[in-house]
Protein backbone atom coordinates (compact mmCIF):
# COMPACT_ATOMS: atom_id res chain seq x y z
CA UNK A 1 0.00 0.00 0.00
CA UNK A 2 2.86 2.36 0.89
CA UNK A 3 4.45 1.71 -2.51
CA UNK A 4 1.30 2.61 -4.45
CA UNK A 5 0.71 5.67 -2.27
CA UNK A 6 4.01 7.18 -3.37
CA UNK A 7 3.38 6.28 -7.00
CA UNK A 8 0.10 8.19 -6.61
CA UNK A 9 2.02 11.14 -5.12
CA UNK A 10 4.40 11.03 -8.10
CA UNK A 11 1.59 11.09 -10.67
CA UNK A 12 -0.14 14.04 -9.00
CA UNK A 13 3.16 15.88 -8.52
CA UNK A 14 4.29 15.40 -12.11
CA UNK A 15 1.01 16.41 -13.72
CA UNK A 16 0.24 19.39 -11.49
CA UNK A 17 3.80 20.79 -11.28
CA UNK A 18 3.59 22.04 -14.87
CA UNK A 19 -0.14 22.35 -15.46
CA UNK A 20 -0.90 25.71 -13.77
CA UNK A 21 -3.13 24.42 -10.97
CA UNK A 22 -0.63 24.08 -8.04
CA UNK A 23 1.07 20.78 -7.27
CA UNK A 24 1.32 21.45 -3.52
CA UNK A 25 -2.40 22.19 -3.22
CA UNK A 26 -3.40 19.11 -5.18
CA UNK A 27 -1.04 16.78 -3.32
CA UNK A 28 -2.60 17.95 -0.07
CA UNK A 29 -6.27 18.07 -1.09
CA UNK A 30 -6.37 14.93 -3.25
CA UNK A 31 -4.48 12.96 -0.59
CA UNK A 32 -7.13 13.96 1.94
CA UNK A 33 -9.93 12.98 -0.45
CA UNK A 34 -8.46 9.49 -0.78
CA UNK A 35 -7.94 9.16 2.96
CA UNK A 36 -4.15 9.51 2.83
CA UNK A 37 -1.89 11.74 4.87
CA UNK A 38 -0.65 15.08 3.57
CA UNK A 39 2.78 14.08 2.20
CA UNK A 40 4.30 17.24 3.67
CA UNK A 41 6.86 19.62 2.21
CA UNK A 42 9.87 17.28 2.60
CA UNK A 43 8.35 14.35 0.69
CA UNK A 44 6.86 16.70 -1.92
CA UNK A 45 10.21 18.39 -2.51
CA UNK A 46 12.10 15.09 -2.91
CA UNK A 47 9.53 13.72 -5.37
CA UNK A 48 9.85 17.00 -7.29
CA UNK A 49 13.38 15.93 -8.27
CA UNK A 50 11.69 13.68 -10.83
CA UNK A 51 10.09 16.77 -12.34
CA UNK A 52 13.49 18.50 -12.54
CA UNK A 53 14.95 15.55 -14.45
CA UNK A 54 11.96 15.73 -16.80
CA UNK A 55 12.66 19.40 -17.60
CA UNK A 56 16.32 18.63 -18.26
CA UNK A 57 15.38 15.78 -20.57
CA UNK A 58 12.67 17.66 -22.48
CA UNK A 59 14.74 20.82 -22.97
CA UNK A 60 18.20 19.20 -23.11
CA UNK A 61 19.03 20.76 -26.51
CA UNK A 62 17.79 24.22 -25.53
CA UNK A 63 19.78 24.17 -22.30
CA UNK A 64 23.09 23.02 -23.78
CA UNK A 65 23.11 24.73 -27.16
CA UNK A 66 20.79 27.74 -27.13
CA UNK A 67 21.51 30.44 -29.70
CA UNK A 68 20.47 34.07 -29.70
CA UNK A 69 19.09 34.48 -33.20
CA UNK A 70 19.49 38.27 -32.95
CA UNK A 71 23.26 37.83 -32.82
CA UNK A 72 25.56 36.89 -35.67
CA UNK A 73 27.79 35.06 -33.22
CA UNK A 74 26.02 31.99 -31.84
CA UNK A 75 26.58 31.26 -28.17
CA UNK A 76 27.73 27.75 -27.28
CA UNK A 77 28.52 28.35 -23.63
CA UNK A 78 26.23 26.51 -21.22
CA UNK A 79 26.92 28.94 -18.40
CA UNK A 80 26.92 32.25 -20.20
CA UNK A 81 24.44 32.19 -23.06
CA UNK A 82 21.42 34.46 -22.90
CA UNK A 83 18.93 31.78 -21.89
CA UNK A 84 20.94 30.64 -18.89
CA UNK A 85 21.62 34.22 -17.78
CA UNK A 86 17.87 34.79 -17.93
CA UNK A 87 17.20 31.71 -15.80
CA UNK A 88 19.80 32.89 -13.27
CA UNK A 89 18.22 36.35 -13.02
CA UNK A 90 14.74 34.86 -12.69
CA UNK A 91 15.88 32.60 -9.86
CA UNK A 92 17.25 35.37 -7.63
CA UNK A 93 13.90 36.43 -6.06
CA UNK A 94 12.82 32.94 -4.96
CA UNK A 95 16.26 32.25 -3.46
CA UNK A 96 16.12 35.54 -1.54
CA UNK A 97 12.59 34.93 -0.24
CA UNK A 98 13.32 31.26 0.46
CA UNK A 99 16.37 32.09 2.59
CA UNK A 100 14.41 34.69 4.58
CA UNK A 101 11.59 32.21 5.26
CA UNK A 102 14.00 29.41 6.20
CA UNK A 103 15.93 31.63 8.62
CA UNK A 104 13.18 33.74 10.14
CA UNK A 105 9.89 31.84 9.63
CA UNK A 106 10.64 28.28 10.84
CA UNK A 107 6.96 27.34 11.12
CA UNK A 108 6.04 28.45 7.61
CA UNK A 109 5.29 24.93 6.30
CA UNK A 110 2.74 24.44 9.10
CA UNK A 111 1.24 27.92 8.96
CA UNK A 112 -2.20 29.13 7.89
CA UNK A 113 -0.90 29.42 4.33
CA UNK A 114 -0.90 25.62 4.09
CA UNK A 115 -4.49 25.37 5.36
CA UNK A 116 -7.41 24.35 3.14
CA UNK A 117 -9.00 27.80 3.52
CA UNK A 118 -5.85 29.55 2.33
CA UNK A 119 -5.46 27.14 -0.60
CA UNK A 120 -9.08 27.77 -1.65
CA UNK A 121 -8.77 31.56 -1.50
CA UNK A 122 -5.40 31.60 -3.25
CA UNK A 123 -6.70 29.29 -6.00
CA UNK A 124 -9.66 31.60 -6.68
CA UNK A 125 -7.43 34.69 -6.70
CA UNK A 126 -4.96 33.04 -9.07
CA UNK A 127 -7.76 32.06 -11.45
CA UNK A 128 -8.64 35.75 -11.83
CA UNK A 129 -5.00 36.77 -12.32
CA UNK A 130 -4.51 34.07 -14.95
CA UNK A 131 -7.66 35.16 -16.78
CA UNK A 132 -6.50 38.78 -16.88
CA UNK A 133 -3.04 37.72 -18.08
CA UNK A 134 -4.47 35.47 -20.79
CA UNK A 135 -6.59 38.22 -22.33
CA UNK A 136 -3.93 40.93 -21.92
CA UNK A 137 -0.92 39.36 -23.63
CA UNK A 138 0.56 41.24 -26.61
CA UNK A 139 2.44 38.14 -27.85
CA UNK A 140 5.44 40.19 -29.02
CA UNK A 141 8.18 38.82 -26.74
CA UNK A 142 9.84 35.42 -27.12
CA UNK A 143 12.94 33.54 -25.95
CA UNK A 144 15.10 35.38 -28.48
CA UNK A 145 14.11 39.02 -27.99
CA UNK A 146 13.22 39.24 -24.29
CA UNK A 147 14.96 41.72 -21.98
CA UNK A 148 16.54 40.84 -18.66
CA UNK A 149 14.10 42.96 -16.58
CA UNK A 150 11.32 40.67 -17.89
CA UNK A 151 13.12 37.74 -16.30
CA UNK A 152 13.28 39.50 -12.95
CA UNK A 153 9.54 40.24 -12.99
CA UNK A 154 8.79 36.61 -13.82
CA UNK A 155 11.17 35.56 -11.04
CA UNK A 156 9.31 37.73 -8.52
CA UNK A 157 6.07 36.04 -9.56
CA UNK A 158 7.74 32.66 -9.07
CA UNK A 159 8.68 33.63 -5.51
CA UNK A 160 4.98 33.92 -4.63
CA UNK A 161 4.60 30.24 -5.51
CA UNK A 162 6.15 29.44 -2.12
CA UNK A 163 2.56 29.93 -0.93
CA UNK A 164 0.60 26.67 -1.52
CA UNK A 165 -2.13 27.13 -4.10
CA UNK A 166 -0.38 29.79 -6.17
CA UNK A 167 1.20 27.40 -8.72
CA UNK A 168 4.72 28.13 -9.85
CA UNK A 169 3.87 27.61 -13.52
CA UNK A 170 0.62 29.58 -13.19
CA UNK A 171 2.37 32.56 -11.61
CA UNK A 172 5.32 32.62 -14.00
CA UNK A 173 3.31 32.08 -17.19
CA UNK A 174 0.85 34.78 -16.10
CA UNK A 175 3.62 37.30 -15.42
CA UNK A 176 5.28 36.44 -18.74
CA UNK A 177 2.00 37.04 -20.57
CA UNK A 178 1.46 40.32 -18.71
CA UNK A 179 4.99 41.31 -19.79
CA UNK A 180 4.08 40.71 -23.44
CA UNK A 181 5.42 37.20 -24.08
CA UNK A 182 3.74 34.85 -26.53
CA UNK A 183 2.04 31.88 -24.88
CA UNK A 184 4.34 29.13 -26.17
CA UNK A 185 7.59 30.76 -25.07
CA UNK A 186 6.03 31.91 -21.80
CA UNK A 187 5.34 28.26 -20.98
CA UNK A 188 8.81 27.15 -22.09
CA UNK A 189 10.58 29.79 -20.01
CA UNK A 190 8.38 28.96 -17.02
CA UNK A 191 9.47 25.33 -17.18
CA UNK A 192 13.15 26.16 -17.65
CA UNK A 193 12.98 28.58 -14.74
CA UNK A 194 11.76 25.67 -12.63
CA UNK A 195 15.07 23.81 -12.89
CA UNK A 196 17.03 25.81 -10.28
CA UNK A 197 14.05 26.71 -8.08
CA UNK A 198 12.66 23.18 -7.78
CA UNK A 199 16.17 21.75 -7.40
CA UNK A 200 17.04 24.19 -4.61
CA UNK A 201 13.77 23.46 -2.79
CA UNK A 202 14.43 19.72 -2.98
CA UNK A 203 18.03 20.21 -1.83
CA UNK A 204 17.03 22.31 1.19
CA UNK A 205 14.20 19.99 2.25
CA UNK A 206 16.41 16.92 1.75
CA UNK A 207 19.05 18.18 4.16
CA UNK A 208 16.47 19.62 6.55
CA UNK A 209 15.02 16.13 6.91
CA UNK A 210 18.39 14.40 7.37
CA UNK A 211 17.45 13.36 10.92
CA UNK A 212 14.32 11.65 9.61
CA UNK A 213 16.07 9.48 7.01
CA UNK A 214 15.61 6.33 9.04
CA UNK A 215 11.83 6.79 8.84
CA UNK A 216 11.72 7.51 5.09
CA UNK A 217 10.42 4.67 2.89
CA UNK A 218 13.20 5.00 0.32
CA UNK A 219 12.00 2.45 -2.24
CA UNK A 220 8.42 3.85 -2.40
CA UNK A 221 9.85 7.38 -2.42
CA UNK A 222 12.11 6.48 -5.35
CA UNK A 223 9.11 4.96 -7.16
CA UNK A 224 7.27 8.25 -6.65
CA UNK A 225 10.23 10.18 -8.05
CA UNK A 226 10.36 7.99 -11.19
CA UNK A 227 6.59 8.28 -11.64
CA UNK A 228 6.88 12.06 -11.30
CA UNK A 229 9.50 12.06 -14.07
CA UNK A 230 7.24 10.36 -16.63
CA UNK A 231 4.06 12.21 -15.66
CA UNK A 232 6.02 15.49 -15.82
CA UNK A 233 7.12 14.74 -19.38
CA UNK A 234 3.49 14.20 -20.36
CA UNK A 235 2.42 17.42 -18.64
CA UNK A 236 5.18 19.54 -20.23
CA UNK A 237 4.45 18.25 -23.72
CA UNK A 238 0.71 18.72 -23.27
CA UNK A 239 0.83 22.22 -21.81
CA UNK A 240 3.18 23.73 -24.38
CA UNK A 241 0.99 22.48 -27.23
CA UNK A 242 -2.30 23.33 -25.52
CA UNK A 243 -1.42 26.81 -24.23
CA UNK A 244 0.06 27.81 -27.60
CA UNK A 245 -3.30 27.43 -29.32
CA UNK A 246 -5.92 27.64 -26.55
CA UNK A 247 -4.52 29.84 -23.80
CA UNK A 248 -5.16 29.47 -20.07
CA UNK A 249 -8.94 29.75 -19.84
CA UNK A 250 -9.63 26.06 -19.16
CA UNK A 251 -7.25 26.21 -16.19
CA UNK A 252 -8.87 29.45 -15.02
CA UNK A 253 -12.26 27.73 -14.86
CA UNK A 254 -10.78 24.66 -13.19
CA UNK A 255 -9.00 26.68 -10.50
CA UNK A 256 -12.09 28.74 -9.80
CA UNK A 257 -14.24 25.62 -9.37
CA UNK A 258 -11.50 23.89 -7.35
CA UNK A 259 -11.27 26.79 -4.92
CA UNK A 260 -15.05 27.13 -4.54
CA UNK A 261 -15.47 23.39 -3.89
CA UNK A 262 -12.85 23.51 -1.14
CA UNK A 263 -14.60 26.49 0.46
CA UNK A 264 -17.94 24.66 0.48
CA UNK A 265 -16.37 21.57 2.04
CA UNK A 266 -14.41 23.20 4.86
UniProtKB/Swiss-Prot annotation:
InterPro entries per the UniProt record, alphabetical: UppP
Record-listed E.C. numbers: 3.6.1.27
Alphabetized UniProt keyword annotations: Antibiotic resistance, Cell inner membrane, Cell membrane, Cell shape, Cell wall biogenesis/degradation, Hydrolase, Membrane, Peptidoglycan synthesis, Transmembrane, Transmembrane helix
Family: Belongs to the UppP family.
Species: Prochlorococcus marinus subsp. pastoris (strain CCMP1986 / NIES-2087 / MED4)
Gene name linked to the record: uppP
Additional remarks: Bacitracin is thought to be involved in the inhibition of peptidoglycan synthesis by sequestering undecaprenyl diphosphate, thereby reducing the pool of lipid carrier available.
Any one GO cellular component localisation term in the record: plasma membrane
Listed GO biological process terms: cell wall organization; peptidoglycan biosynthetic process; regulation of cell shape; response to antibiotic
UniProt KW Chloroplast keyword: no
GO terms for MF: undecaprenyl-diphosphatase activity
TM spans (from-to): 1-21, 39-59, 87-107, 117-137, 153-173, 189-209, 216-236, 246-266
Lineage: superkingdom: Bacteria
Topology in membrane: Multi-pass membrane protein
HAMAP family in alphabetical order: Undec_diphosphatase
Function: Catalyzes the dephosphorylation of undecaprenyl diphosphate (UPP). Confers resistance to bacitracin.
Chief localization: membrane
Record localization: Cell inner membrane
Name by which UniProt lists this protein: Undecaprenyl-diphosphatase
Record field: catalytic activity: di-trans,octa-cis-undecaprenyl diphosphate + H2O = di-trans,octa-cis-undecaprenyl phosphate + phosphate + H(+)
